[in-house]
Amino acid sequence: KMPPVSKRIKYKVEHVLPLLDEYYPTMDKCYLHYTKPYELLIATILSAQCTDDRVNIVTETLFKKYPTLESFAQADLAEMEQDIRTTGFFRNKAKNIILCTRALLERFNGELPSDIESLTSLAGVGRKTANVVRTHIFHIPSIVVDTHVKRISNKLGFTDSQDPVKIEFELMRIFPEEYWGRYNTQIIAHGRTICKARNPQCEKCFLSEYCDQ
């Protein structure tokens, strides 16, 4: 059984989340470009250890070359590796994209499933990727834990864990559900502009009084 949420954490949550809404009001958008649901799944697989900007450059060509789910499922592995090479870890990613798109056709009639168990049963799909899909395709409240969310949630004292799954459940426990979906994109925006990993602009930060570091 989880211990009750402390007064201090409750106080921070009540102040920090509305401030994020104030400074990043339209942040339920997705940084990865896609037009079809399965394209977001592929883009998210590619985004592991890679910037969203780089993924968007690659998928602009990739989604034209493979315009259907079937074309991905039938792709040549060596060719796919070259197509996505610049995203890094391209051998694993190419294999996972082909296996994943085949599974969608064979097991899910070419449709993306919405439940976390089915999504994470697909090759290359962990909870983070599944939650991106659940948030942006199905509008199911989910917390996506990426490097920005991990780092900044630790700084704010919302969690002291380094484990993305633990962080996800801790944040779900302390945040009202209506904030779950947009917390990730707001924190990414904050992490890119103000709370940068290497050179945080603490003097400009509207959250500095709630920050533990």
Regions found by a protein language model. Give the residues of each.
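Catalytic cores of DNA base-excision repair glycosylases
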Residues: 4-213
